[in-house]
């Protein structure tokens, strides 16, 4: 029944009808690692919690439904989810990856996966000619972030998924920034979706989690084997917290988008700001593609200051907005990508994509937008006065 309802109803009802014994509206935390067998050769469906646990199973069922996949796998972090997906590949395999990429993903690919002989080429995934140039006989998959972090570049998922499918490649999409509330990559042709569920899905900066959602029986079976064998699974407490956060995802994403759009437009007109990178703005190069494949916009964007000397005093003077290294929570956070989230990416790549010493990233929370703008205004004013 739930899968026929609107996504708002699906989210609010996660786990609420899954506990038949007591009728608990909130699905309980099964803090157990082992489960009794009725008799030899029989199982309740749960044996050992690394392989499967009741609380995590309810979360995974909900995630698969929301992302239109056949199965989902909850991991101990977003990086654990990516690591599990990357172990689909073997020594000698090659991946094509979005050029503008989260620094942690780049670090995992370049400093860990290369040890096992898996290599990657980084390319603008909107440029099919450039991707074709990087295509190798041993290429197995394409990994896409859309929007990218932090420059908010948009990739046409239908186009890229079709291109990949024609060449026998898997399409993996990081959907962290939009969530299934605004974008469902599997419906657009992707094979695998990954999330840092720590971010918008959890939404409260209090749970570390990752999700993998996949389509196709064979692919799901292989991921289930890897998920169990690697063992970077999500525990019952964190599974419960993630489900609790997801129940309010619709309300939060709508407020994130509303606030971010208002603040992006405010900064666009500010004398200290050179450029704002946010797909909701009409001048954004990916605006039309974003509107075609997504029903809304994320709550995160980046902006470039005219003078790098503004950065330090702005970060020192913000009060309501926290200078902290994450995104997607109800609290607003500001980050300096060049020295934080993207510090592991070589400087020449950072500069090529625009992650320089003038770029700040703002994860807009659900506070009142007037208070957030007032905080930015006073910080920008204070920074200007210090530089005079």
Can you say where each PLM-predicted feature lies in the sequence?
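PLP-dependent enzyme catalytic core of the Aspartate aminotransferase-like
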Residues: 119, 133, 137, 252, ...
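Glycine-rich phosphate/pyrophosphate-binding loop
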Residues: 29, 37-58, 333-358
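Short, well-ordered beta-strand elements within core beta-sheets of diverse protein domains
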Residues: 242-251, 298-306, 361-365
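Conserved small-domain helix->loop->beta segment predominantly found in fold-type I
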Residues: 261-325, 345-351
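Conserved PLP-enzyme active-site core in the AAT-like
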Residues: 2, 13, 72-272
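Glycine-centered tight turns that cap/initiate beta-strands
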Residues: 68, 138, 272-275, 320, ...
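N-terminal glycine-rich, Lys/His-bearing helix-loop that initiates the first secondary-structure elements
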Residues: 1-46, 388
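Conserved N-terminal alpha-helix of the aminotransferase class I/II PLP-enzyme fold
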Residues: 34-83, 87-88, 104-111
């Amino acid at each position: 029944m739930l899968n026929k309802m609107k996504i708002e109803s699906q989210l609010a009802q996660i786990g609420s009808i899954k506990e038949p014994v007591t009728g608990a509206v909130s699905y309980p935390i099964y803090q157990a690692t082992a489960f009794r067998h009725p008799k030899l050769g029989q199982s309740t469906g749960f044996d050992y919690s690394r392989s499967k646990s009741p609380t995590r199973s309810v979360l995974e069922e909900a995630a698969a439904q929301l992302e239109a996949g056949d199965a989902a796998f909850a991991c101990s972090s977003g990086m654990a989810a990516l690591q599990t997906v990357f172990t689909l590949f073997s020594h000698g395999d090659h991946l094509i990856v979005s050029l503008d990429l989260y620094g942690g993903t780049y670090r995992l690919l370049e400093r860990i996966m290369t040890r096992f002989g898996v290599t990657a080429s980084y390319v603008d995934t909107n440029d099919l000619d450039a991707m074709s140039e990087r295509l190798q006989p041993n290429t197995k998959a394409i990994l896409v972030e859309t929007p990218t972090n932090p420059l908010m570049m948009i990739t046409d998922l239908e186009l890229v998924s079709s291109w990949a499918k024609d060449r026998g490649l898997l399409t993996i999409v990081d959907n962290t920034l939009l969530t299934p509330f605004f974008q469902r990559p599997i419906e657009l042709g992707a094979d695998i979706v990954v999330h840092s569920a720590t971010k918008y899905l959890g939404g409260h900066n209090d749970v570390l989690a990752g999700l993998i959602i996949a389509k196709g029986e064979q692919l799901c079976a292989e991921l289930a084997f890897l998920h169990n064998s690697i063992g970077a699974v999500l525990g019952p407490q964190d599974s419960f917290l993630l489900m609790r956060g997801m129940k309010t995802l619709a309300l939060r994403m709508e407020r994130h988008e509303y606030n971010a759009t208002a603040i992006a437009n405010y900064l666009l007109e500010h004398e200290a700001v050179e450029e704002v990178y946010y797909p909701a703005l009409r001048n954004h190069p990916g605006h039309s593609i974003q509107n075609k494949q997504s029903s809304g916009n994320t709550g995160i964007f980046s902006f470039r200051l005219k003078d790098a000397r503004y950065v330090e005093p702005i970060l020192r003077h913000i009060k309501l907005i926290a200078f902290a290294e994450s995104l997607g929570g109800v609290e607003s956070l500001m980050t300096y990508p060049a020295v934080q989230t993207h510090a592991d990416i070589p400087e020449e790549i950072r500069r090529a994509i625009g992650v320089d010493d003038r770029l700040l990233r703002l994860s807009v929370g659900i506070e009142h937008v007037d208070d957030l703008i007032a905080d930015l205004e006073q910080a920008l004013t204070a920074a200007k006065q210090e530089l005079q």
